[in-house]
Amino acid sequence: MTDKQTLKLKLDRLEEILSGYGQMLVALSGGVDSVFLTSFAYRLWGDDRIAALTASGPHFAPDEIEYARGFCEKLGISHKVQDVSFIMPVIEDNPTDRCYHCKKAIFSELVQRAQMVGSVLADGTNLSDMDDYRPGHRALEELGIASPLKEAGLTKPEIRQALHMIAEEDSAIASAFMITTPSGDTMPIWEKP
């Protein structure tokens, strides 16, 4: 089986997984994984069944928050920014399990928002993330956060490839990438680290 065939099977599986959700609220960081998940769902549903929520605080990059906001605005996807500055005391002592506590606090807040609107809360965790030590994943599992990219078996390189394909096939998504990319930045999001 070729790499393209494998990717197609995984994308078909992702579509099947997402079809099981009534509505989905994506925890949109502005990074490649959550942008891909948002783009893929948008292609399936338009803006009817998807919304995005971005956490903000002193420990988040303002340019990624602005990218997420601009991306959603361009596509007409409902987008909210949730301030999570309150978590700073949880992590200011820099404990060894700070990633767990940080994710738990942030996603506990996001889960409440998702429950208020009756949506599944999904994040951009993918199969490649399982290769690293990431204590924050335990918090996601405890909170029941959906990780459809991981469930579909998609790796980071496959996500980059699929995002590039989507941009080539869908002019609205390609336009959203271009409009929200800072001037002078010529690197497409699927190539960013």
Which residues does each PLM region occupy?
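Mid-to-C-terminal catalytic subdomains of enzymes
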Residues: 150, 154-193
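ATP-dependent adenylation/nucleotidyltransferase module used to activate substrates
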Residues: 1-165
